[in-house]
Amino acid sequence: MEPGVAARVAAVADPVLQGMGYRLVRIRISGESGCTVQVMAERPDGTMQIEDCEAVSRALSPVLDIADPIDRAYRLEISSPGIDRPLVRRSDFERHVGHLVKIEMAVAYQNRKRFRGIIKGVEGDGVRITRDDVAKDADPDVVLPMADIGDAKMVLTDELIAESMRRGKAAEREKKRDLGLAPPLAPHAKPAAQAKPKPKAKDGKPAKKPLPTDTKKHRLAADRARRGEIDPD
């Protein structure tokens, strides 16, 4: 596909996504088995459910048909970035500080194009990573110019999976709150018992606890009273 087509699709898709509360991650156009336009999007919190993809597809498809940024038949595909997502913006690197990343440079840096390491932070126009594939006597830290990065992708790790699950659960709770649905009660949980009101005090003195009236002593006294042996009063 000719250069600039992805940019034209992005110019059409980005306003639609922003209006729906999503963020455009990447446009990828493939010519294999026909033309496929892949629109990768996400929520502000980095999540994207199947329902979100369906909503974006319904909204974006007619807009692309009218704008017609591609001069041939194509298949529209809406996808989420996934756990091992690409990093394309400054905010992507900032959000994933502490995680492992693979970077392919479009322009060689220090005579190499491939880097792998932990993201330490963003400094100016570069991203600092601590490489995990250097010799013991070499400095593992390197700052790569973001403008020269051709492709950057997260490496699937247990830590990344755990964070993705946490974000997914948080997004699900937020969705339920937006719909006004309370989270279901856990099977083992019981409703909290309501405290019974305490007897009110009279004349500034604590109220006395009522004495029991159904003890053995009371029953014997009542029996003798019925036989006329004692006065029940």
UniProtKB/Swiss-Prot annotation:
Its main location: cytoplasm. The keyword Flavoprotein does not apply. InterPro entries: Ribosome_maturation_RimP (IPR003728), RimP_C (IPR028998), RimP_C_sf (IPR036847), RimP_N (IPR028989), RimP_N_sf (IPR035956). It comes from the Bacteria. Residues 167-233 are annotated as: Disordered. Residues 187-196 have a biased composition (Low complexity). This is Ribosome maturation factor RimP. The lineage of its organism: Bacteria, Pseudomonadati, Pseudomonadota, Alphaproteobacteria, Hyphomicrobiales. The gene is rimP.
